[in-house]
Every structure is written in structure tokens, then in C-alpha cells.
Amino acid sequence: MRTAQQEIDERTKLAGNNKFELLLFRLGESPGNGQRELFGINVFKVREVLVMPAITELANAHSHLMGVANIRGQIIPVINLPAVLGCQPKNGLTILMVTEFGRTVQAFAVEDVREIVRLEWDQVLPAEASHAGALITGIARLDGAIANTRLAQVLDVEQILRNVMPVSHEELTREVVGPAMTLPPGSSILVADDSAVARSVIELGLNAMGVPFIMTKTGKEAWERIQHIAEEAKAEGQTVQSKIAVVLTDLEMPEMDGFTLTRLIKQDARFKSIPVVIHSSLTGTTNENHVKSVGADAYVGKFAPRELAATIRKVLALD
């Protein structure tokens, strides 16, 4: 029988090969067509799945916050996921998905959980390409690129969490992120993140740091941009390092994940000296160890501007 750590290690190895596991679930009938669509969340973000426990309602809470549940002594907020997406569960909310990401623990109530599927990231289309809503990061083609493949909507749980349980963050100013950074003339920080809320926070942070940046939405887009910049630099008689000071990348992204992007950069003689910082809500020792194995220079959790600024200074030796 495999241990929990063995399962984690196996999933971590998947990530290094541009693969991941998606937990599929249903929320009830969709508001548009009444169909019971499939939704998904990366298994790495799921701590456990439980039969719905007792919920204690909270006074004056957000309408989508059902209350809190006592899970083995830990008080965890419970979000009504069908209500967030406008779905109508016909069989009630029977399952609780307890999740952990971005250094917080929260649970999502759903109608039912279906299965775990193993996919490659290139089976996931970015939200913009599929005209999905603001709470969707991508559409997963569960059976590959065949005509009648099943589809699952990959939720932007970070955005959902911030909508339902907004956290007050300190204003992103020079006092927070430190003095302005000076990059070599003509160079920028290249960012890759599929989450709209994460991109907006990163943009605010980098603006406060006073550094120019290039924003991309997937690892594939970032990789293509790096190669394009390399060609431009070559034509100008310069190195790509004079154009890209740091690559700041998420881990979970449609088409190509951050692990694969990092490995491609570090295995290419033209790019391997460019510092790569993994910036992800998938915090934890296992992920941080795997980051080191693919050659990333640093790892920092999302929505921590002080730490992000300090990490960028460190990899650029600006301290």
C-alpha cells in the first residue's frame, strides 16, 4: 500500500513532465443550458474530500460563505461553490473539498465528486482561447484532441477565494517593497501567470518596485516570447540576458506549466544563466524541493509582495 508521501512524490514527478492530476466534480445544473457540467481543480490543492459535515453559519457573512466546519479541531470556512458559479444542485451539497493553497485552508461545498484524471497541460486551453468566464482559468480536454472529448472547466479558485473572502493587503508602496530596483538598461522581468488576479497583484508589485516587465499568461506563451526576444537580441548583437533580467513564473498554467518552462530555460545554453523565480500558491516542502531539481533559482508564495521583492533582489544580487 502506497503512503501519502509516495503519492505526493509521484504527483510531483508528473509536474516535471508537464502533467498533472485533476479532481473532477459537479455543481448541479448550469444557469445557461441546465446541463450538469464537469469542473476541475488541481489535486495538489486538495487536502481531502469529505462527506458534508455540520456547518455553523456566520452572522453578516458573504452570501456565498456557508459558514465554518470543524475538521479535526481546525475551524475551516466553507464556500458554496455552486452559488458562486450560479449552478443549481439537484441532489444537495453532499461533498466538501478541503483545499490548501496560498498559505490558507478553505473548503468548497459541491454536489458530487466524480474521479481523478491524469492529463498533460497541453490538453488545457487557456480561458481566453475558449472565451470562458472570469472564474475559469482553462478548459481541459479530458480525452485529448478528439472531436467528442469530454470537457471540464478548471476553476480559478484563487479568484473565487478573493471574491468571497477578500483579504485586506497593505498598499503596495516603496515602503512595503523597498527602494526602487535598477535593472540594466533595456532589460525587463518576464512574468508568466494564468490567473487574472495574480497578474494584477504582480503588476502592482513590480510597478511599486519600479521595474519594467513583460506579462504573459501561459508557460508556452512565455517560452515563445523568450525565443523571440533571443532572436531580436542576436540581430542587435546583444545577449538575451541583456533583455530579460528575471523570469517569474507560476506553476499551474494551461499548455505548459512552470516546471516545464523552467527546465526548458535551464537546459538551453542561451538562457540558463537567466534567474528563474517560481511564484506559486502551491507552497510546501515537496514543491520547493522539486523546484530546485528543475533548476529554478528561488521559490516564493503568491500574494507576498515583501517576500517577492526580497527574492528578486536576492537573485539579481541587488542587496
Where do the language-model regions lie?
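Acidic-histidine catalytic/liganding microenvironments
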Residues: 268
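An acidic, low-aromatic, low-complexity terminal/linker signal
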Residues: 1-221, 225-237, 242-245, 251-260, ...
